[in-house]
Amino acid sequence: MANKKIRIRLKAYEHRTLDTAAGKIVENATRTGATVAGPVPLSTERSLYTIIRATHKYKDSREQFEMRTHKRLIDIINPTQKTVDALMKLDLPSGVNVEIKL
């Protein structure tokens, strides 16, 4: 291929589904003959929301909710056409966001 590297960035709320998706990508890429670097765990983005429990008063009574976004980075170096075809046909679990840069 003309491009020397494919960078895949994965995001998910659950780290187990993220790790299974990363494992499938690495397995398919190595099976087709490409060199793989990763999966590299990136920093986890944490969103914290504080909400007042009561509707009108009692501001001291609050509840906190948290949402974590886990991220992984995979580099596929010197991909072949078989590698690209295998990645296009790959079925990943739902809930995993995939960003691909060539």
UniProtKB/Swiss-Prot annotation:
SMART domains, per the entry: Ribosomal_S10 (SM01403)
Family: Belongs to the universal ribosomal protein uS10 family.
Keywords: Ribonucleoprotein, Ribosomal protein
Pfam families in the record: Ribosomal_S10
NCBIfam families xref list: PRK00596.1 (NF001861), rpsJ_bact (TIGR01049)
GO molecular function: structural constituent of ribosome; tRNA binding
Superkingdom: Bacteria
GO biological process per UniProt: translation
Entry's Gene Ontology cellular component terms: ribonucleoprotein complex; ribosome
Functional summary from the UniProt entry: Involved in the binding of tRNA to the ribosomes.
Span of the signal peptide: none
Protein name: Small ribosomal subunit protein uS10
Species annotation: Streptococcus thermophilus (strain CNRZ 1066)
InterPro entries: Ribosomal_uS10, Ribosomal_uS10_dom, Ribosomal_uS10_dom_sf
Assembly mode: Part of the 30S ribosomal subunit.
